[in-house]
Amino acid sequence: LQNVLGKWPAAPGLEPAAALILAVHLEAVAKLPTGELIGFHGQTLSHDPQNFRTHQLGDGSELARQAGVAVAWDFRSEDVARGGQGAPLAPIYHWALARYKQMQEPVAIVNLGGVGNLTWVDARLPPERGLLAFDTGPANAPLNDFMLKTTGQAYDADGALAASGRVDTQVVATFLQQPYFSRPAPKSLDRDSFGDMAGLVAQLSAADSAATLTAICVAAVVAGLPLMPVQPKQMWISGGGRKNCEMMRQLAVNLPMKVVDIDDIGLDGDMLEAQAFAYLAARVARGLPTSFPATTATKAPLCGGRLSLP
């Protein structure tokens, strides 16, 4: 898949990667209990919403045919075609989760994956008025890249290396001067929007580098606080970042609200994204909106995605 990143549909050499994506999804379907509907995200190879185009590799119609199950897929194209960013798409699921937890006040849900995403939810309101979403900035991606290059480890286990170092506050402050952080929400990034961030910490020790890259993730979340319509009393953390003890410690120290590992309230922080696309699939099947002006900057609520029958 690394060899086809950045390619658009007409590019040569996509067939082996498409076949691999189909095969692994068919394998997963075979291992799971039989369902009535599959939400199939595909693999994003290229994303250029400024020019109204996005490309997720994977043929949902072929998956439906071979799996014998209806498939909702191609969730982003319609949003991008109508002037939206095509991301993030999980916020409507976050709204449903807040309703499920019977929240009677606004809450922020932050997913710390390669990039950080924040959804502000007021579940007392309909999604057209009770949602705001944006990408906060880099999260695990630069730290993981640094760890792999420097130590051979895929990530900073428990945040141990970062916890042993000192944050270079000047590096953090300089990074936050980038124009992205002064833009209004909604706004989105991809994993490589800020380029190779290793150069920011090239003069620091390994421990100080890890501490500083962790602090950048936290500072980006803090920088997003003024964008929320009402400051929530809780922030639920999902994604791999919640397993980084130092990252969670820094969030708790620097945020004015209670920071909660989403697992601690009975939700599954590892499966949230997969669950979100199952939920999106159900909405597509019913013709319900999957994105909104305050989540992707689309001009009106719309139902993205295609539905393919077996």
What are these regions (language model features)?
Residues L1-P12, E128-L131:
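Short glycine-rich, Thr/Ser-proximal phosphate-binding strand/loop in the N-terminal lobe
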Residues W8-G60:
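Short beta-strand-loop/turn "lid" adjacent to the catalytic site in phosphate-handling enzymes
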Residues V24-L32, A206-Q231:
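Phosphate/ATP-binding catalytic cores across multiple sugar-kinase/actin-like superfamilies
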Residues T34, M103-E105, P229-K233:
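Short helix-loop-beta connector
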Residues P49-T54, R65, V69-Q153, C303:
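Phosphate-binding/catalytic loop of phosphoryl-transfer enzymes
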Residues P126-V218, T296, A300-P310:
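Conserved ATP-utilizing enzyme core subdomain
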Residues A215, D263-P310:
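Glycine-rich phosphate-binding/hydrolytic loop that grips phosphoryl groups
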Residues P232-A252:
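Glycine-rich phosphate-binding loops at beta-strand->alpha-helix junctions
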